[in-house]
Amino acid sequence: MENAKMNSLIAQYPLVKDLVALKETTWFNPGTTSLAEGLPYVGLTEQDVQDAHARLSRFAPYLAKAFPETAATGGIIESELVAIPAMQKRLEKEYQQPISGQLLLKKDSHLPISGSIKARGGIYEVLAHAEKLALEAGLLTLEDDYSKLLSPEFKQFFSQYSIAVGSTGNLGLSIGIMSARIGFKVTVHMSADARAWKKAKLRSHGVTVVEYEQDYGVAVEEGRKAAQSDPNCFFIDDENSRTLFLGYSVAGQRLKAQFAEQGRIVDADNPLFVYLPCGVGGGPGGVAFGLKLAFGDHVHCFFAEPTHSPCMLLGVHTGLHDQISVQDIGIDNLTAADGLAVGRASGFVGRAMERLLDGFYTLSDQTMYDMLGWLAQEEGIRLEPSALAGMAGPQRVCASVSYQQMHGFSAEQLRNATHLVWATGGGMVPEEEMEQYLAKGR
């Protein structure tokens, strides 16, 4: 972006200056509305989410047999919700900032099959595509026991079709493993940020991995192009897919059930704050949408991004969405948080969700490494760097009197609050890689 343009952008949006300087930045969104007001802009409804629930239930008998690690939950891919009181104390000590309320962790990092939040959206979209093909071919009805999809005739049928996706790692992992298991030929276009172990794991499942020297946006574009030339190839579009988004949104009702099981209350007197790491935006956008449908105006969602990849904060704050990238303002999009190394946000997610998100913040790689170490020490939970992005959120909220006043929170409401950090990945990181992460914390 030439200087004159850049200067006028900064004059209009002074916060951009802090982003360019790679400062850890927090922006509380003045444009938030009620769910009733913001929902029409999403373009999806509660019924769409219910349909996704129903589809995952139909596939549960299949998943329970195809992936024995899901048998205990009857083929439902869901993660634990745990309190992390020792980490809460450690954060308060390190940052000299009390966190009022209780700190919880949602362990999507340990979801079965692919060990990340992408096991929600990625697997769901592959299943939705497989169902559509099998229904159209007359091989399946909605009333069938879907475990029949494990038969050789279905494997044979699906092998005529292929799936392509562009990814920094975790989405590729979930889509690759699921597609290969069901019988599709699958190609994952991996950006330069993708970890070597993720590529190796995919190849071990018979997935074709195409590697790029460039970032996520290029990998997606190349994947899209490659798929266009083959009518039997289905491209899963992380930037624009409503299906992926709905796969993530199912998490809302499921979390509501987990809260009820644990006797946790969310209402006007007991607000819920949720902190979601954000790459291109599909995962956190879908989850936040589901949470809003489940808890209404009593849930407050925040997106967390690396200082080197603040694409969603930049897009929503300036209103330019996918018309601007972090590279346009001179930021390199290089971060240890490989799952969040995205320079241009999803325009679909930004426009759909901008009224339903309370805020956005950035944190440095070093901050993620530090918190990764603290969590391992205090709670014995090991995550990958991206998954710690949410962990900085509770301090930002508890330290901001202006945010609390903007929403009219009383001291008592804050004392009764629940702060939920969404841990997005790390359950499958190899031991030696994890040791390297732990060594970088202070």
Curated annotation (Swiss-Prot):
Biological process terms in GO annotation: D-serine catabolic process; isoleucine biosynthetic process
Catalysis performed (reactions): D-serine = pyruvate + NH4(+)
Keyword Lyase: yes
Protein name from the UniProt record: D-serine dehydratase
Superkingdom per UniProt: Bacteria
Species of origin: Escherichia coli O157:H7
Keywords: Lyase, Pyridoxal phosphate
Annotated EC: 4.3.1.18
PROSITE patterns named among the record's database cross-references: DEHYDRATASE_SER_THR
Enzyme class: lyase
Subunit structure: Monomer.
Modified residues (N6-(pyridoxal phosphate)lysine): K118
